[in-house]
């Protein structure tokens, strides 16, 4: 099937040949808007570094696995809620008020997290940040699409996406910087507080920026819409008239759609009754779900925790390694920009998918090697000989674990290791200070850990989060490979394909449904990672993500069509059966014939006028 190239716009007016000059106003508008992407990336990633210190902060400890998962995952969970309601809110009140509201929510969330004195207060702050992210993720791209010059809209929307990755890099950098300033009492608070600065900058900028001309026009403010267009296009009359015609045509089409809805019911019911659109919506939603089931936000939200479990002890080193990994995630998306039109969506998606499967399998293998290489756990009889033994249920369950790696994976246990022989005991933690002491055995608080009565024992070191291993570098390198292969296709292609799959009347609703799918599975993955590692081990968790991605590969191979080079009408036909496609093609041909006859009549009329003159 050959793509149809349209020389004129939807309004029927030819697009001006010469692009307008970009003035200061456009640069200010674009720069202020994409700060929303930066805040999105920063506030979802800063938790990785901060959670090295928050669980041991005064007033917030002890913090078990469930609390850690909830504090991390509540933000994407509330982002789903914020994104769902922001669409209707921006249609009713305007894009600008919602963006200003999101900046204030970002500031409140940053301040609440920074001053949090209990786990509940921290949770409230993370809820605020999630709502702000939800608002920004939905409304800022719409604002950019409606308030920027036509020829740079794609660039600015892409810049918003890139700023998400840039925000993730900066979050790790600031985590590294602030980790040197009393991290357990002040440093982690500064990590959260820093996000308030760009949020305030965006707030101040948007006080002076206008509402989008499209929203103004659709809500009866025609004169104001023209004034905004004059600022955007620097007084270029040709472009202003063109854009006004586009907005008018869109408004008329939307009015027709609303009238159609009154006759046929809500769009969602029309989707359910239209098999090929329902099929496209299902495929689009599954692509968003698979993006999350591939484990990307496990890597991004728990970067520091994963690096620590690979055997890195120094927290500063952990955070700076996180910076390098986040840079991998930043540079990967440049690949689609160069190859997506040459290779096509399917090939690039399948390549990215295959790379993710291989890297997830290798991450799992790496952690299997780390586990097998970690210090063995002495049996119970050796523990009794060591002294300072108190028998209880927790101690018995910890002693049953095989080695250091399985021991530190449990939130109730830690490893008391002989620093010379790399052997030791898996002991229950001291809940007053889980990172420093065990509740019984040779690593209890106040006990001299030298014990000459125990063979080969000199000094015991308490390990709560990591084990000494020769394979530390392997999981870290494989995480870098994972981020590169994931970001070169899996990051952007679910969004690209969802923007192409649907007819105009169903696009907004179907994209909202698929976006909700993304956020819901984001929440599920973020909420279950730590519990999953306890239940099936770290390597088991990554192999499970690999299985999901293999299913995604099969799904894409058999069900996702190639959309490169096809028009919107042609893409819609790709989801139809043969009978539906024939009917659609006949209707489309009739429409093209009618348009051709209209053009001929216009040409004849023009020729007559020329002769008369």
Curated annotation (Swiss-Prot):
Entry GO CC: apical plasma membrane; basal plasma membrane; perikaryon
Family annotation (PROSITE patterns): MFS (PS50850), SUGAR_TRANSPORT_1 (PS00216), SUGAR_TRANSPORT_2 (PS00217)
Keywords: Cell membrane, Glycoprotein, Membrane, Transmembrane, Transmembrane helix, Transport
Membrane topology: Multi-pass membrane protein
Superkingdom, natural source: Eukaryota
UniProt topological domain (Cytoplasmic) ranges: 1-21, 91-96, 141-157, 211-279, 339-347, 494-515, 561-613
Catalysed conversion reaction: myo-inositol(out) + H(+)(out) = myo-inositol(in) + H(+)(in)
Induction context: Induced by hyperosmotic stress.
Extracellular topological domain: 43-69, 118-119, 179-189, 301-317, 369-472, 537-539
Polar residues compositional bias, start-end: 602-613
UniProt-recorded Gene Ontology molecular function terms: myo-inositol:proton symporter activity
Expressing tissues: Expressed in the excretory canal cell and in pairs of amphid and sheath glia.
Region (Disordered): 594-613
Record-annotated disulphide pairs: none
GO biological process: myo-inositol transport; transmembrane transport
UniProt cross-references to InterPro entries, sorted A to Z: MFS_dom, MFS_sugar_transport-like, MFS_trans_sf, Myo-inositol_Transporter, Sugar/inositol_transpt, Sugar_transporter_CS
Record-annotated membrane-spanning stretches: 22-42, 70-90, 97-117, 120-140, 158-178, 190-210, 280-300, 318-338, 348-368, 473-493, 516-536, 540-560
Glycosylation sites: 372, 451, 456
Subcellular location: Cell membrane; Perikaryon
Family to which this protein belongs: Belongs to the major facilitator superfamily. Sugar transporter (TC 2.A.1.1) family.
Role played: H(+)-myo-inositol cotransporter. Probably by promoting the transport of myo-inositol regulates intracellular osmosis in response to hyperosmotic stress.
Name of the protein: Proton myo-inositol cotransporter hmit-1.2
Organism encoding this protein: Caenorhabditis elegans
The encoding gene: hmit-1.2
């Amino acid at each position: 099937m050959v793509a149809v190239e349209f020389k004129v716009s939807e309004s029927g007016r030819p697009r001006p040949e010469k692009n307008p000059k970009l003035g200061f106003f456009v640069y200010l508008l674009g720069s202020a808007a994409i700060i929303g992407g930066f805040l999105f990336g920063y506030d979802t990633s800063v938790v990785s570094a901060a959670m090295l210190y928050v669980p041991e902060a005064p007033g917030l400890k002890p913090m078990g696995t469930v609390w850690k998962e909830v504090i991390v995952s509540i933000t994407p969970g509330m982002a789903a809620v914020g994104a769902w309601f922001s669409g209707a809110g921006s249609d009713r009140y305007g894009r600008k008020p919602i963006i200003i509201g999101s900046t204030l929510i970002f500031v409140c969330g940053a301040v609440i997290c920074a001053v949090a004195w209990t786990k509940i207060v921290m949770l409230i702050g993370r809820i605020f940040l999630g709502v702000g992210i939800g608002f920004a993720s939905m409304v800022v791209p719409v604002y950019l699409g409606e308030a920027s010059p036509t020829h740079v809209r794609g660039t600015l929307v892409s810049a918003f996406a890139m700023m998400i990755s840039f925000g993730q890099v900066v979050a790790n950098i600031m985590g590294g910087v602030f980790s040197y300033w009393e991290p357990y009492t002040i440093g982690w608070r500064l990590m959260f507080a820093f996000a308030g600065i760009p949020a305030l900058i965006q707030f101040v900028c948007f006080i002076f920026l206008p509402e989008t001309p499209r929203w103004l026009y659709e809500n009866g403010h025609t004169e104001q819409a023209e004034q905004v267009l004059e600022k955007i296009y620097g007084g270029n009359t040709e472009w202003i008239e063109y854009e006004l015609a586009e907005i008018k045509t869109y408004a008329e089409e939307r009015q027709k759609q609303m009238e159609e809805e009154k006759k046929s019911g809500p769009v969602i019911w029309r989707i359910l009754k239209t098999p090929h659109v329902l099929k496209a919506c299902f495929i689009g939603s599954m692509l968003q779900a698979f993006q999350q089931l591939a484990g990307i936000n496990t890597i991004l939200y728990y970067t520091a925790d994963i690096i620590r479990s690979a055997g890195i002890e120094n927290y500063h080193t952990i955070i700076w390694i996180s910076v390098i990994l986040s840079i991998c995630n930043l540079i990967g998306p440049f690949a689609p920009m160069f190859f997506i039109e040459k290779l096509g969506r399917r090939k690039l998606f399948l390549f990215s998918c295959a790379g993710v499967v291989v890297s997830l399998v290798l991450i799992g293998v790496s952690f299997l090697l780390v586990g097998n290489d970690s210090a063995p756990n002495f049996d119970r009889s050796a523990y009794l000989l060591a002294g300072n033994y108190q028998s209880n249920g927790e101690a018995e369950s910890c002693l049953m674990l095989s080695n250091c790696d399985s021991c530190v994976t449990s939130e109730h246990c830690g490893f008391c290791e002989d620093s010379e022989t790399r052997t030791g005991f898996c002991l229950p933690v001291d809940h007053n200070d889980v990172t420093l002491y065990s509740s019984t055995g040779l690593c209890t608080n106040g006990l001299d850990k030298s014990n000459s009565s125990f063979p080969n024992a000199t000094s015991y070191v308490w390990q709560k989060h990591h084990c000494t291993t020769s394979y530390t570098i392997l999981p870290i390198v494989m995480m870098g490979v994972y981020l590169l292969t994931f970001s070169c296709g899996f990051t952007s292609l679910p969004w690209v394909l969802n923007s192409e799959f649907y007819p105009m009347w169903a696009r907004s609703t179907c994209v909202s449904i698929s976006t909700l799918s993304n956020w819901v599975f984001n929440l599920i993955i973020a909420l279950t990672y730590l519990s999953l590692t306890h239940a099936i081990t770290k390597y088991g968790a990554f192999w499970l993500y690999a299985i999901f991605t293999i299913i995604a590969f099969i799904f894409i191979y058999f069900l996702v069509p190639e959309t490169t080079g096809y028009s919107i009408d042609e893409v819609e036909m790709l989801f139809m059966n043969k009978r539906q496609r024939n009917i659609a093609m006949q209707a489309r041909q009739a429409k093209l014939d009618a348009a051709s006859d209209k053009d001929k009549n216009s040409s004849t009329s023009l020729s007559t006028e020329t002769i008369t003159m």
